[in-house]
Amino acid sequence: MQQQLDALQLEALKAIREAADLTILERIRVDFLGKKGKLSALLGGMARLPAEERPVVGALVNQVKARVEEALAAQQTHLQDQLIELRLVAEALDVTMPGRFVPPGRLHPLTATTDRIVDVFVGLGFTVASGPQIETEYYNFEALNTPADHPARDMQDTFYLSDGLVLRTQTSSVQIRYMEENDPPVRICVPGRVYRRDQVTNRHSPVFHQLELLAVDEEITFGDLKGTLTFFTQEMFGDRPVRFRPSFFPFTEPSAEVDVQCRFCDGKGCRTCSHTGWLEIAGCGMVDPNVFQAVGYNPEKVQGFAAGMGIERIAMLLYDINDIRLFYTNDLRFLRQF
């Protein structure tokens, strides 16, 4: 029996050393150590041995099994290392080769302008807010001191939907929603898309972008409004002349419009500025007491100012663009300039 075990061990170790891959090695393991393997067959003959020899033979079998298993593990590690080396060679990267060119993305000029405007007002302590683009007539008109029979509704050709809904004509509607849910003091800026039934021209579009500004606190004055917007125009346009001219909005009183000198003609008058020398960028004013009452604020205790500015107009001034329609054409020749 011992001679048979020694011969089996030598045969197994030789086969293991010569195994060229893991598949052959696994086949050798099953052939020698499997349930129907050669070692199991020898163990089956132990029943015919005298009782006093069985412990000795059992110990020899365990030694052979341990040596074969040790050789199998060592050869498996060796073959796995070889596979890793071959894979590393096959997948080696030439670090001197040029990489794939991925064209860098760019911000659309309207997005870049919006981000720049928001950065200015966030730096002044304002928080960014947002609201739905499909609005109720209440939030778009009534709560902003524009009842159904108010003549100011004729000033805005609105996209009316069903069930008393509209495409919002201004981001001012977010003022109401925010004040309903938050007590003063309030300082928010609201960038967003708005809709009006305007004719498409070089200065007007039925879909455009606004940024709304609202500040509510005790003892806020028109001087605070003027100072805030003057600082904003200086941050955006430098020392270019700015003017505030009286205007009318149903939700502010007094009201004004903010114009920046046209940079295409330096105030001399051109087609872009309708030969006025100025480009309107914002409407503003002190919040009407009726608006405060609509949201449950006491107009005797708080005051506030609001402003709404056209992002397209500001982008036109920043980038010397004389036609608003260029923003919406998706012309890469235009967009790649920014």
UniProtKB/Swiss-Prot annotation:
Binds 2 magnesium ions per tetramer. GO terms for cellular component: cytoplasm. GO terms for biological process: phenylalanyl-tRNA aminoacylation. Its cofactor is Mg(2+). It is found in: Cytoplasm. PANTHER family: PHENYLALANINE--TRNA LIGASE, MITOCHONDRIAL (PTHR11538:SF41), PHENYLALANYL-TRNA SYNTHETASE (PTHR11538). Tetramer of two alpha and two beta subunits. This is Phenylalanine--tRNA ligase alpha subunit.
